[in-house]
């Protein structure tokens, strides 16, 4: 149990982010539940953590805005005095994924703004403000290994995350801070299920050797391992959590 450590989880009002917030709170972390726009859902996560005996606050911040990312850390420190863990879960994936040649500028810019710039902003803050022995955990995707048509731009944003993860781990030499990423496969969240037919969902569920979709708790458990003390020798790595899909 980490009774004195503080974790920021971005994009934590729903889905995988909410599951991570609940899991880290159960492990004893005080959790900063970041959200971009859904205050009601974020409040539900905070209330659920409190009902289970944990500590949490909700902080609105669009992490694609550098000033908002800075304020997120400021409010975490104001509430709890420190930050030990950053989980960069916030990200977007459009329900319709056109081929690269059919992708418009607005879609490209929005994906890179949230998925790359948002994580960059919070990593930059964390690099300067995390405690010795801290953890930065980013989110990639197993789609990088699959190379599926239609995912070129989305996967490119996550490829950038993997590169920054590996290099930042080296740049933080001497601080005792690890930087890793988790790359989920198909996971049963609203983000994943939106716009897909039952047949498509069934086909994707059967693709992995374990013959099911991942769950938010599967990913939250992986995150808990990577930010915990047992993974202190894992650094600069991307762990694929996809049931053996790739």
Residue ranges of predicted features:
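Short C-terminal tail/terminal secondary-structure segment
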Residues: 97, 146, 206, 224, ...
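Alpha-helical segment proximal to the catalytic Tyr-Lys
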Residues: 128-129, 170-174, 232
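Conserved mid-core segment of classical short-chain dehydrogenase/reductases
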Residues: 70, 93-109, 128, 150-153, ...
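Active-site helix of classical SDR
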Residues: 123, 157
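Catalytic Tyr-X3-Lys loop
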Residues: 101-120, 137, 161
């Amino acid at each position: 149990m980490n009774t004195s450590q503080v974790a920021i989880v971005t994009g934590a009002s729903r889905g995988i982010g909410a599951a991570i917030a609940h899991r880290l709170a159960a492990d004893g972390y005080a959790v900063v539940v970041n959200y971009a726009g859904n205050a009601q859902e974020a409040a539900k996560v905070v209330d659920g953590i409190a009902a289970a005996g944990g500590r949490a606050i909700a902080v609105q911040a669009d992490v694609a805005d550098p000033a908002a990312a800075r304020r997120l850390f400021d409010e975490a420190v104001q509430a709890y005095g420190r930050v030990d863990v950053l989980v960069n879960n916030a990200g977007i994936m459009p329900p319709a994924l056109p081929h690269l040649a059919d992708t418009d500028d607005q879609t490209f810019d929005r994906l890179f703004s949230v998925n790359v710039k948002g994580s960059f902003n919070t990593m930059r803050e964390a690099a300067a403000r995390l405690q010795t022995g801290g953890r930065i955990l980013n989110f990639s995707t197993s789609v990088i290994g699959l190379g599926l048509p239609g995912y070129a731009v989305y996967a490119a944003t996550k490829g950038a995350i993997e590169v920054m993860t590996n290099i930042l781990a080296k740049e933080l030499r001497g601080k005792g801070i690890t930087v890793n990423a988790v790359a989920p496969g198909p996971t049963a969240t609203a983000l994943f299920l939106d716009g897909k037919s039952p047949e498509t969902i069934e086909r994707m569920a059967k693709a992995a050797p374990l013959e099911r979709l991942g769950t938010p708790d599967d990913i939250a458990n992986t995150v808990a391992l990577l930010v915990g003390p047992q993974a202190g020798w894992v650094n600069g790595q991307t762990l694929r959590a996809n049931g053996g899909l790739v």
